[in-house]
Amino acid sequence: MAAGTETLKRTPLHDRHAAAGARLVPFAGWEMPVQYAGIRPEHVAVRTKVGVFDVSHMGEVETSGPDAEAFLQRILSNDVSKIAEDGAQYSVLCKDDGGVLDDLFTYRLGPQRFLTVTNASNHEKDLAWFKQHASGFDVEVHDRLHDYAMLAVQGPDARGLVAQLAEGELPKRFRTTTLTLATAPDVLVAGTGYTGEDGVELLLAPEHAGTVWDALTERGAVPVGLGARDTLRLEVCFHLYGNDLSEDRGPIEAGLGWCCKEDTGFIG
């Protein structure tokens, strides 16, 4: 272990990564697997079969209350009113001057309840921004970082593999559902991802992450680290905060005008 890593946060799957021989590196305050067998074979596995990523370092913010939709409409760039009750939507969080604080996915969990997934490096900043702008809205904002582990199962065979473990039907693209998965209850399954492949992302209680990870890898899902996650997203031109987006660069300049709905009156 490199000097100083004892201060880094660890995901619930850390011991499994170490046992699998993963190369662990500091990333956004976490000790994360950058690769297992190697970036190239992991990249190919996702493009041709199925890979599984531990993305539990990503943050979660829950927003609820009578004004939850109106509040998110104010701070997020996309049209939050268009998110179906089981839907998901990509957007950006902007400063007053239009600089990008983060790019995010928001899931509608109910008529007045939403879950927004933040980038790991921006979670505390995003949470503070949410709370700062909640004044005047009948809304509650809660940090859910430690309430969820998050796995991404991606590739042409991803849905078929997850379906073997699921008690119920998987959601379509940009939709969500809650299922029991490999005996793990109340898993939020979202038809989203960061690879350009079909697949799902799983948000579940941290104590069940190991059970689901084991069930997936035992059935052929290849563990994939952050290295291949980056090459996969780069290959399909998905944005990376800190490279393509920053507080000094607006969403229009970054090519994200499609998710900025000016008629909603969002900040930025």
Residue ranges and their predicted role:
Residues 1-34, 109-267:
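Conserved, structured C-terminal
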Residues 41-45, 99-102, 131-134, 184-187:
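Short hydrophobic/aromatic-rich motifs at helix boundaries and adjacent loops
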Residues 1-94, 99-101, 227:
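Acidic, proline/glycine-enriched N-terminal capping motif
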Residues 55-66, 107-115, 153:
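N-terminal glycine-rich flavin-associated loop
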Residues 79-133:
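Well-ordered mid-protein domain cores that form the structural environment of catalytic cofactors
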